[in-house]
């Protein structure tokens, strides 16, 4: 009974360790739910870009437009596509398939159930440069922020988290001919986001222990996909294609430790829904909406002065504050190295994943700072 009796104790310790990682997530405060509707460019007046909040102020008080000799619909918010691209790129890096496993599969009939905790560095104070030359702190503007005692959210996230935690329940099942299928569902800390996805890999070379081939490492290729749920504002899907090598080392007590190393090409796909850049203003109420004209324009009973004596126009400017971002298509090159430990039922792992190249070497709109992810895993191997 000796060695086997120690398994429950070790498994309890491992699960307790992973649980402590989950609890530690509460130390990060700030409300990291994406708010892409805040990532807007301000209009120009006399060729000069206006300050932050100007288009929102005009939407709330259309009479301000007449003071600068313009109409409200000429002073609408427009999407800051560069800021959105940076937000999607860094969030996609954090939520992408982690490739946290060795090249050797679980074997036909093998099964692993585990919990993975991953922490990804983001550029919390990162700045993007918009098409008009304006600078935006995309994590400050693009995430929810704190909640006031009256239940209202702040206009910006003044202290975005520098780490994004993702806690994933994974199941891996060995298949014939060296294939393995993974399923994953995860929660993104300090948000309402969840990730779901699956991985498939094929061990090209595995299991040789004797003879000349016994000196070669196990080699596998694989692919994985993750997508998010929990947000009606944006859609994010990541696809990874990887190759890795590993070599199991059997220890004296029959435990197996397996170091591994690999490369992943990551593809990030992001899109936005139609967003209201001025959620505090009811466009239909403001215009006195009565229906749609033959041209498709809203029919409004309320009017607003143009600045010219006696002239008014329909107060329909806020309808122009519905925005959609350009689709985001990004490629990232990532390296990873890690180690797994297996003893009877107990399965543990640790991995470090990192950018091999600067993001802006592939897309000049992106921030140059490289990202990394540290992952820990604990579970059972059947």
What is each of the regions a protein language model found here?
Residues 111-115, 179-181, 198, 214-223, ...:
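Transmembrane beta-strands of outer-membrane beta-barrel proteins
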Residues 30-40, 329, 333-335, 340-382:
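Predominantly the C-terminal beta-signal and adjacent terminal strand-loop region
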Residues 154-157, 184-186, 227-232, 320-325, ...:
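Extracellular loop and loop/strand-boundary signature of outer-membrane beta-barrel proteins
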